[in-house]
Amino acid sequence: MTRLSACLAVLLALAPLALAQSPADTVRAGQYDNGKMWTFDFPPLDYFEETYGLTLDDEWLTTARMGALRIPNCSASFVSPSGLVMTNHHCAREQITAVSRPGENLLDDGFYAQSMSEERPAPEMYAEQLIRIEDVTDEVLAALEATQTDAERADARTTAIDSITARIETAMGDAFTAEVIALYNGGRYSAYTFRRYDDVRLVMAPELQLGYYGGDADNFTYPRYALDMTFFRVYND
């Protein structure tokens, strides 16, 4: 008998014993074990109330949605009525470097505008605010009814989405962008309308050693002793 055959024989002999001694499977999957991120239009309100004792109404959800922002490769939040925006330090490093003047290294040294006139415009920086969510599922699926092949369905879907996007952006004006999002593996399509702010200025950024204190090892560790933040301000022309 070879060594491999001997090992297999031992494993087969021990398998029934291991199964007999194993306790019954007591693991039960929770309702949201696969993730706890939801769209603004379908939050699990009953779950929030039963689990956390938190009762949310439409006004609260609208305030949360209007306070959330999308910036290049990151998210951010409005934190004042005067357009002040807060995000993570790493989300702003490119902009911090871009507004540094000759002889300055604001990424390493930090920046603070003592008045609004000292805030520095960040080139190619923008912020987008989700102002409306529209269910366009019926419109997209209707465009697929006459299709027969996967290629035809893909083309029809793209055409329908482009048409919806163009219609919304034409109706809303230049300050707005639209994006159709496919959800639930194509079971639902939502048209998101964003208010876009292109005049974004740097207000405050700590020096890199404070903003990145602890590095990746400390990320998502609490309490965490770092000034992992940057402040911008958006201006509405």
Language-model features, listed with the residues they occupy:
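N-terminal secretory signal peptides that target proteins for export/translocation
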Residues: 1-2
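Terminal presequence/propeptide segments associated with secretion/organelle targeting
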Residues: 19-237
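Bacterial N-terminal signal peptides
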Residues: 5-16
